[in-house]
Amino acid sequence: MTTPACFRVCEDFTDRYTDVKMSGMNYAFFCPAFTKRPPYYHNTRVYSCILLSNDIYESGELYWRGKFNEDTDLSLRVMKGGYHTYLFCAMLCGKVATLTMKGGNTKEVYGIDQAGTKHDRVGGEDFDHRREFAESLHAQHPDEVRITQKWGRWHHHIDYTVFQNKKPTKKPDLNIPKGTNNYGMKLVKLKSTTPLDEYEELNVE
Protein backbone atom coordinates (compact mmCIF):
# COMPACT_ATOMS: atom_id res chain seq x y z
CA MET A 1 0.00 0.00 0.00
CA THR A 2 1.39 3.37 -0.99
CA THR A 3 -1.08 5.60 0.86
CA PRO A 4 -1.75 6.38 4.53
CA ALA A 5 -5.49 5.94 3.85
CA CYS A 6 -5.30 2.62 5.69
CA PHE A 7 -4.98 4.51 8.97
CA ARG A 8 -8.06 6.58 8.17
CA VAL A 9 -10.03 3.41 7.40
CA CYS A 10 -9.15 1.90 10.78
CA GLU A 11 -9.82 5.14 12.64
CA ASP A 12 -13.21 5.69 11.00
CA PHE A 13 -14.33 2.14 11.73
CA THR A 14 -13.19 2.38 15.35
CA ASP A 15 -14.94 5.72 15.77
CA ARG A 16 -18.30 4.14 14.96
CA TYR A 17 -18.46 2.89 18.54
CA THR A 18 -18.54 4.46 21.98
CA ASP A 19 -16.74 1.65 23.77
CA VAL A 20 -14.07 0.43 21.34
CA LYS A 21 -10.97 1.75 23.08
CA MET A 22 -8.23 -0.19 21.29
CA SER A 23 -7.76 -1.31 17.70
CA GLY A 24 -4.96 -2.00 15.28
CA MET A 25 -3.71 -3.85 12.23
CA ASN A 26 -2.75 -7.51 12.22
CA TYR A 27 0.75 -8.51 11.12
CA ALA A 28 1.10 -9.31 7.44
CA PHE A 29 3.03 -12.50 8.23
CA PHE A 30 0.05 -13.73 10.28
CA CYS A 31 -2.18 -13.37 7.20
CA PRO A 32 -0.35 -14.92 4.22
CA ALA A 33 -1.87 -14.11 0.84
CA PHE A 34 -2.86 -17.74 0.22
CA THR A 35 -5.08 -17.88 3.33
CA LYS A 36 -8.52 -16.47 4.05
CA ARG A 37 -9.14 -14.11 6.94
CA PRO A 38 -12.16 -12.08 8.04
CA PRO A 39 -11.85 -8.29 7.63
CA TYR A 40 -11.38 -7.98 11.39
CA TYR A 41 -11.40 -9.88 14.68
CA HIS A 42 -13.48 -8.55 17.57
CA ASN A 43 -12.13 -8.61 21.12
CA THR A 44 -8.71 -10.12 20.84
CA ARG A 45 -5.16 -8.93 21.49
CA VAL A 46 -3.74 -6.04 19.47
CA TYR A 47 0.03 -5.93 18.92
CA SER A 48 2.46 -3.13 18.01
CA CYS A 49 0.40 -1.10 15.50
CA ILE A 50 -2.18 0.22 17.96
CA LEU A 51 -4.85 2.94 17.99
CA LEU A 52 -5.83 3.87 21.55
CA SER A 53 -8.61 6.09 22.79
CA ASN A 54 -7.15 9.02 24.73
CA ASP A 55 -9.86 8.91 27.38
CA ILE A 56 -8.51 5.68 28.86
CA TYR A 57 -5.45 7.66 29.97
CA GLU A 58 -7.45 10.65 31.15
CA SER A 59 -9.54 8.41 33.39
CA GLY A 60 -6.41 6.83 34.86
CA GLU A 61 -7.89 3.34 34.66
CA LEU A 62 -5.73 2.00 31.82
CA TYR A 63 -2.06 2.59 31.12
CA TRP A 64 1.08 0.83 29.88
CA ARG A 65 2.76 -1.27 32.54
CA GLY A 66 5.29 -4.07 32.98
CA LYS A 67 8.32 -5.16 30.99
CA PHE A 68 6.99 -8.13 29.03
CA ASN A 69 3.87 -8.59 26.88
CA GLU A 70 2.74 -5.03 27.52
CA ASP A 71 0.39 -5.00 24.54
CA THR A 72 -1.26 -8.29 25.54
CA ASP A 73 -1.66 -7.06 29.11
CA LEU A 74 -3.25 -3.81 27.96
CA SER A 75 -5.54 -5.65 25.53
CA LEU A 76 -6.77 -7.88 28.35
CA ARG A 77 -7.34 -4.97 30.73
CA VAL A 78 -9.32 -3.10 28.07
CA MET A 79 -11.62 -6.10 27.57
CA LYS A 80 -11.88 -6.95 31.27
CA GLY A 81 -12.85 -3.33 31.86
CA GLY A 82 -15.94 -3.85 29.70
CA TYR A 83 -14.50 -2.17 26.61
CA HIS A 84 -13.81 -3.62 23.18
CA THR A 85 -10.94 -4.14 20.73
CA TYR A 86 -10.73 -4.70 16.97
CA LEU A 87 -7.85 -6.32 15.12
CA PHE A 88 -8.01 -5.53 11.41
CA CYS A 89 -7.06 -8.05 8.74
CA ALA A 90 -8.39 -5.96 5.85
CA MET A 91 -5.47 -3.62 6.56
CA LEU A 92 -2.16 -5.18 7.63
CA CYS A 93 1.13 -3.84 8.95
CA GLY A 94 4.49 -5.11 7.74
CA LYS A 95 6.18 -5.46 11.11
CA VAL A 96 9.83 -6.43 11.11
CA ALA A 97 10.30 -9.74 12.91
CA THR A 98 11.47 -9.62 16.52
CA LEU A 99 15.27 -9.58 17.02
CA THR A 100 16.03 -8.54 13.44
CA MET A 101 16.38 -4.80 14.14
CA LYS A 102 18.49 -3.07 16.76
CA GLY A 103 16.92 -0.79 19.34
CA GLY A 104 13.72 -1.24 21.30
CA ASN A 105 13.77 -4.41 23.39
CA THR A 106 16.40 -6.20 21.29
CA LYS A 107 19.24 -5.55 23.76
CA GLU A 108 17.45 -4.83 27.04
CA VAL A 109 14.85 -7.61 27.00
CA TYR A 110 16.15 -10.21 24.55
CA GLY A 111 19.88 -9.81 25.27
CA ILE A 112 20.88 -9.51 21.61
CA ASP A 113 24.15 -7.67 20.90
CA GLN A 114 23.76 -7.59 17.11
CA ALA A 115 20.33 -7.88 15.53
CA GLY A 116 19.74 -10.21 12.60
CA THR A 117 18.06 -13.42 11.55
CA LYS A 118 18.34 -16.56 13.65
CA HIS A 119 21.40 -17.46 11.53
CA ASP A 120 23.50 -14.32 11.93
CA ARG A 121 22.41 -12.43 15.07
CA VAL A 122 24.96 -12.14 17.89
CA GLY A 123 24.28 -12.64 21.59
CA GLY A 124 21.42 -14.15 23.48
CA GLU A 125 22.54 -17.74 22.86
CA ASP A 126 21.57 -18.71 26.40
CA PHE A 127 18.82 -16.13 26.65
CA ASP A 128 15.28 -17.43 26.51
CA HIS A 129 12.90 -15.49 28.69
CA ARG A 130 9.85 -17.03 27.10
CA ARG A 131 8.82 -18.72 30.32
CA GLU A 132 9.45 -15.49 32.23
CA PHE A 133 7.31 -13.66 29.66
CA ALA A 134 4.49 -16.16 30.14
CA GLU A 135 4.78 -16.20 33.93
CA SER A 136 4.73 -12.41 34.07
CA LEU A 137 1.48 -12.27 32.09
CA HIS A 138 0.00 -15.10 34.17
CA ALA A 139 0.80 -13.19 37.36
CA GLN A 140 -1.06 -10.16 35.98
CA HIS A 141 -4.04 -12.20 34.73
CA PRO A 142 -4.21 -15.60 36.48
CA ASP A 143 -7.90 -15.84 35.57
CA GLU A 144 -7.28 -15.66 31.81
CA VAL A 145 -3.72 -16.83 31.10
CA ARG A 146 -2.39 -20.39 30.96
CA ILE A 147 1.30 -21.24 30.62
CA THR A 148 1.86 -23.83 27.94
CA GLN A 149 4.40 -25.13 25.46
CA LYS A 150 4.07 -24.67 21.72
CA TRP A 151 6.63 -25.71 19.13
CA GLY A 152 8.99 -26.77 21.91
CA ARG A 153 9.00 -23.36 23.61
CA TRP A 154 7.15 -21.73 26.48
CA HIS A 155 4.18 -19.55 25.58
CA HIS A 156 1.13 -18.02 27.16
CA HIS A 157 -2.33 -19.13 26.04
CA ILE A 158 -5.47 -17.02 26.30
CA ASP A 159 -9.02 -17.96 25.34
CA TYR A 160 -10.38 -14.70 23.96
CA THR A 161 -13.80 -16.19 23.13
CA VAL A 162 -14.96 -15.35 26.66
CA PHE A 163 -14.92 -11.68 25.62
CA GLN A 164 -16.57 -12.09 22.23
CA ASN A 165 -20.23 -12.56 23.17
CA LYS A 166 -20.90 -8.92 24.00
CA LYS A 167 -21.23 -6.51 21.08
CA PRO A 168 -19.77 -2.99 21.06
CA THR A 169 -22.11 0.00 21.24
CA LYS A 170 -22.62 2.07 18.11
CA LYS A 171 -22.78 5.83 18.50
CA PRO A 172 -26.40 7.04 18.60
CA ASP A 173 -25.85 9.57 15.81
CA LEU A 174 -23.96 7.12 13.58
CA ASN A 175 -24.79 7.43 9.88
CA ILE A 176 -23.01 4.98 7.58
CA PRO A 177 -23.51 5.97 3.91
CA LYS A 178 -24.66 3.25 1.54
CA GLY A 179 -22.21 1.82 -0.94
CA THR A 180 -18.49 1.20 -0.75
CA ASN A 181 -16.01 3.86 0.30
CA ASN A 182 -12.60 3.05 -1.13
CA TYR A 183 -11.06 6.16 0.41
CA GLY A 184 -9.63 7.13 -2.95
CA MET A 185 -7.61 3.93 -3.19
CA LYS A 186 -7.23 1.91 -6.37
CA LEU A 187 -6.13 -1.69 -6.76
CA VAL A 188 -3.26 -1.86 -9.22
CA LYS A 189 -0.79 -4.54 -10.22
CA LEU A 190 2.76 -3.75 -9.12
CA LYS A 191 5.96 -5.01 -10.64
CA SER A 192 7.08 -8.36 -9.33
CA THR A 193 9.22 -8.21 -6.20
CA THR A 194 11.01 -10.82 -4.15
CA PRO A 195 8.87 -11.36 -1.03
CA LEU A 196 10.36 -11.95 2.38
CA ASP A 197 10.44 -15.54 3.51
CA GLU A 198 7.65 -15.00 6.03
CA TYR A 199 7.99 -18.32 7.77
CA GLU A 200 11.76 -17.96 8.05
CA GLU A 201 11.25 -14.57 9.69
CA LEU A 202 8.68 -16.02 12.08
CA ASN A 203 11.27 -18.50 13.32
CA VAL A 204 13.53 -15.78 14.70
CA GLU A 205 11.20 -15.04 17.62
Task: List PLM regions with ranges.
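Conserved catalytic core of nucleotide-sugar-dependent glycosyltransferases
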Residues: 2-73, 80
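C-terminal catalytic/acceptor-binding lobe
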Residues: 66-205
